[in-house]
Amino acid sequence: MFEAFIYNISVIVAGIYLFHRLQYSENKRMVFSKAYVTVLMTIVSLLLSVYPIPYREDYLIHLTFVPLLFLGRFTNMVYTLSATVIVAIVEIVVFNNSIMYGVTLIVIAAVTSAIGPFLKQNDVLSLLILNVVTIIILFGVALVSPIYTLSEVIILIPISLIITLASAITFVDIWHFFSLVNRYENEDKYDYLTGLGNVKEFDRHLNEISRKAEKEHQSIALLLIDIDGFKDVNDTYSHKSGDAVLKQMSQLLKNYVPNQFKIFRNGGEEFSVVIHNYSLDQSVKLAENIRSGVEKSSFHLPNKEVIKLSVSIGVGYLTDDDPKSQRKVFKDADDMVHVAKNQGRNKVMFNPIINL
């Protein structure tokens, strides 16, 4: 029994590590993949089917449902049920388990995937809650079906809780570790909070676009976007609320800025967009769309409060005939941001000084 217990824990932990390792090697940027976690946890569940934990001569403790709890938490019902159907078929056809056992697995998958993604607790506690839900389902099955007895389900409780807890802690710990590695390797280019390019990458990119525009006789424009009254958000609510606002602002900018242009967080509450081969009119219209979009949007804070914000935007612009000076286009945009602030905020300003 002890050997089987160790095997079950080892298989789950190894599967969790393999998921993170393959994910990191494949993407380098640790983008969470539901497909990856589904494939890996399905394989882990099948491996657990091979070596159930023996308890007495006539009873085996099956822990194939434990990896399915991870699917219920981290994916959705489609992924979870798809994996569970595969596991159930293998259990019935290959390992001669009853059809009722397969149906029980599917019921567990349906229930846990219906509630798992919506649990507000941290991941470890959420997985333990899903384990308790599973035990309740198994108690119900024991009352109506002979595949379990109440005493067998009771024996399952401590074993499943220990394995679920160990697996959950391992999953979260390895995820945090690889996330820190990814952050360290990319901190020279990316802002860790928003995922946008940072100020170093902004300087490199603006310099590169300036050289390209000079060579190909293209125009360049720079939008500097500053959140109005952002300090008040931090002071009134919390820095955590400020971080939430910055994340939502970065997503809003992605929704408005065309894919061919790059967005950066320059630091604090300032963002920038580098534009090339656009007319001044097109650049100003893009800035106005962003300003208007922010004004109409609601920003949700961690304490459930909703606030309204505005931005001041300065536009720096060099025509296709102008010498392409990185310093000049930045200074023009920066000057216009200050003009927008001084004239009441929530404005788009460009040179010559005209506000929209």
From Swiss-Prot:
It is found in: Cell membrane. Residues 218-353 form the GGDEF domain. Keywords: Cell membrane, Membrane, Transmembrane, Transmembrane helix. It comes from the Bacteria. InterPro entries: Diguanylate_Cyclase (IPR050469), GGDEF_dom (IPR000160), Nucleotide_cyclase (IPR029787), Rev_trsase/Diguanyl_cyclase (IPR043128), Sig_transdc_His_kinase_LytS_TM (IPR011620). The keyword Transmembrane applies. This is Uncharacterized membrane protein SAOUHSC_00760. It comes from Staphylococcus aureus (strain NCTC 8325 / PS 47). The chain crosses the membrane at residues 2-22, 35-55, 74-94, 99-119, 124-144, 154-174. GO terms for biological process: cell adhesion involved in single-species biofilm formation; cell wall organization; negative regulation of bacterial-type flagellum-dependent cell motility. It is a multi-pass membrane protein. GO terms for molecular function: diguanylate cyclase activity; phosphorelay sensor kinase activity. Gene3D superfamilies: 3.30.70.270. GO terms for cellular component: plasma membrane.
